[in-house]
Amino acid sequence: GAMPENPLIKRLLLNEQSGEVSTAKVPSTPHDSSIGVLNGIARVCEQSKVDLSEITHVMHGTTVATNTVLTGTGARVGLVTTKGYRQVLQIARSFVPGGLGGWVIYQKSEPMAPLELTIEAHERISAKGEVVSVLDESKLRESLKSLANEKIEALTVCLINSFTNSTHEEKVREIALELMPEVPVSISSEVIPELQEYERAVTTVTNSYVRPKVETYINNLESELLERMKEVKLSVLRSDGGLA
């Protein structure tokens, strides 16, 4: 098990045959957290006299995504919404926490996908999943080209009622990847296929915001683990307590 924390990274080694448990702590490496993870694995194996080649599973808990949100160091995110819903993140649910004083002191955080990087798709899906207005692909291409010129690093697609019919979102992603193959695209019908467009939008935008950094981190870590341990399987702790 591996859990990076600042300033230390904790490691726990379990021998499934003997039931023996060993632990170790090493300094974290903020510039590249994967280095600290690998150092910790090497340390706990050395202490336990276990060869790295004997490790079969690495279960990893990380706060890379959380830290990215808290420090505001995520990707430059573009957003595609249905025409008429461009300000979905700004309007939100018009909810202010607290009593009357909340209206005076509450400071709403800036959306992770700013309004100037939000475009509208001319399309409409009904609540029953029926196509009310066919997606205007030519207008979409023009809008996506303008987003590409803004040097976005990730793209979110959140169309009204897409949880009932994801056809238009999937088409938007297809066109976006054609125009911006290097930009990762997250669509709400896959991230959180649920009712309520604001909640769907903000969740999928958050996914896009942390995605490039988390993808790079996990890919680098997995690559290094496989190089050192060959048959090892990497599992990452999810927010619900499960492993993926």
Give the ranges of each region predicted by the language model:
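N-terminally biased helix-coil "hinge/interface" segments that flank
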Residues: 1-244
